[in-house]
Amino acid sequence: MKPLAYAFLAGLAAATGFEPIGLWPLTLAAFALLLRLVRTAPGLRSALARGWWFGVGHFVVGLNWIATAFTYQAEMPASLGYLAVVLLSLYLAVYPAAAAGLAWRWGRKDDLRLILVFAAAWIVTEWLRAGLFTGFAWNPIGVAILATPLSWSAPLVGTYGLSGVAALLAGILLLLFLRRWRSAGAAAAGVAAVALAGFLAGGPAPGPAGPSLRIVQPNIGQQDKWREGFQEENMERLRRLSTWGGSEPRLLLWPEAAVTRPLENGLDDPGHIMEMLELRQEVADMLGDKDLLLTGGVTWRSADGRDVTSATNSVFVIDKAGRILSRYDKAHLVPYGEYLPMRPILSSLGLSRLAPGDVDFDPGPGARTLDLPVIGKAGFQLCYEIIFSGEVVDRKNRPAFLFNPSNDAWFGAWGPPQHLAQARLRALEEGLPVLRSTPTGISAVIDADGRLLKSLPWRTAGVIDTRLPAPRPPTPFARLGNILPLLFSLVLV
């Protein structure tokens, strides 16, 4: 049992490399210990078990913020949050187990081959984790080394390839421990070559900054947002933070679900239609003459014009006249958050989805680029859609920036900084600036190199006034997507 306990403890330690702790050297050391445990496993089943227990420890700590989301919905007992974290971790641990098993099966006879196969397997299993069963791409280990120069591998091999680089670094630590100096040197040279190639693949420096923008963070907690009677205070906070006296054209950015009443609906009732039009005018009155607003909101849908049968979680483009110029509908919905799987069964048990309301959201068509007046081409990723590497941009119509409105008020102290780190990696690998607006933090301006230019702290009301950072030319990853990390994994083996 000792190896399994060591594997579990190593998994716990590995999670400390992510935000808000950021002890990435400890993450690499923990992965080195996992590799040693795989190396000494007496058989395939033992290697699989050690990888699985490592994964359980890793995900239980790294995903602890999920439990917080269950405290805001009366129909979902808060205690279910901890159970959800454990059950999700038990499932996600299958992927580290698979990587460990493949490394043992194909690499156990040679230490250098062991780490190469492990790194390749880790790339593939993280990619699979992001896609199977709706996908959950949170915290690939490449995020842990975002603060290091090795993150420049991302424009070439993407986030999953960067995770492979992190696995190679852990393997180098093991080789040094085993005094395999030549093998360690060869692996280190390979890692350096990938990072250098990624840096060169980034292309020329971005051009000058673009139009003015303001990001609004109203500091509205989840416990207040849907509280009865709070709608007027919600709009007043947005008004106070949005108003300005300038005459220059400006892009104004509000968070996900900033407007809590529907900006569009499919109901025929004149009262609902009038209420919707009045709401649009109320929003338009907050804008300057040349402002353009991007705001999160909802659309009601009705099959018969009388009752709401579904909804969309959307970003609306609104001008000073109160016109909705365009809309992006979130495509990658959160199961149990934005829709309830097996609704007839689970609702009969008294359960509901985490987001308020008793109808499910419909998914949109996917990544989409909208051409905004004066501003130019914009891409949209709502909330956790930004975590899916290779899926955030319409490659046939590349935008000049990505807007990532989110409601991270659900996710306690650990979720927001982890979410921000993953948004930074999307900027780096795609060569596009990312703008984030959230109700409680962390709102931010990220340049095309993944650098955090400006941000607002968690649980703070305020604005960010700046200019739109320029994009880089398309990176290799922006052109080819996740073909590149998969090719990288083939090269490793």
Residue ranges and their predicted role:
Residues 144-150, 191-285, 290:
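Membrane-interface segments at or immediately adjacent to transmembrane helices
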Residues 230, 255-493:
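Solvent-exposed soluble domains appended to multi-pass membrane proteins
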Residues 45, 49, 237-242, 389-392:
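Short, acidic/polar
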Residues 10, 100, 232-239, 281, ...:
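Generic alpha-helical structural signal
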Residues 18-33, 58-65, 217-219, 249-266, ...:
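Short, conserved active-site loops that position catalytic residues or coordinate cofactors/metal ions
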